[in-house]
């Protein structure tokens, strides 16, 4: 009986710890700024209609601003490891904002954390510091562009979400990867459409020192059973999707 009591006490401690780590965001507010918790800052505010009511909604990217999450390297470079979150706010005809989606699961991390750990981070298609370009609202869809840098390569992924079934569901994924070794240069591109349940891809392998080139193409139907939601996307979700359907 005592062991059972200790177990439930430990479980309660874990639950409380997670609640302390999570931020409390309001469900409704009259200003976008009201959704930014104390100790956090705005990184991107992107406006556009996401629910076909002809009223501009808001995609808000925020980042914690805690000195404890800054680290100095041996060459005195300062790295910012502060966590980031994505919020989607629907604006109604009364100019009130409603929180309809949020992700604070590490789906998007800071540029410095991504650089050090080879993770995905929001990226401008022009490779500049304007992160507002990494978010695009087009044809009632929300598109997030991310990039991962490697020693001799990179990975670029565009996630396409649509608001349906009262949530932002992933309806498409565009993936590009390139890598160069001492012998080969590899270019891979995949396009997955979860609405039509199709995958189209190409893999181009070229010799660095030779004229040897090998191109593989794939186009197939996929059995889509899982739904991927913006709120529950994680850092490795994109890779897991590719591993699941590219087989």
Where in the sequence are the language-model features?
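Acidic, small-residue rich beta-repeat scaffolds with periodic aromatic anchors
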Residues: 120-247
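Beta-propeller blade repeat segments, especially FG-GAP/WD-type strand-to-loop junctions
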Residues: 25-27, 67-104, 160-163
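Short glycine/acidic-enriched loop and turn motifs that connect beta-strands
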Residues: 65-67, 150-151
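Bacterial N-terminal signal peptides that target proteins for export
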Residues: 1-10
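Bacterial N-terminal signal peptides
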Residues: 9-19
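Blade-edge motifs of beta-propeller repeat domains
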Residues: 22-38, 94-124
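Acidic/hydrophobic-patterned starts of short beta strands in beta-sheet-rich repeat architectures
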Residues: 50-62, 136-146
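N-terminal targeting signals for Sec/Tat export/insertion, comprising classic cleavable signal peptides
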Residues: 30-57
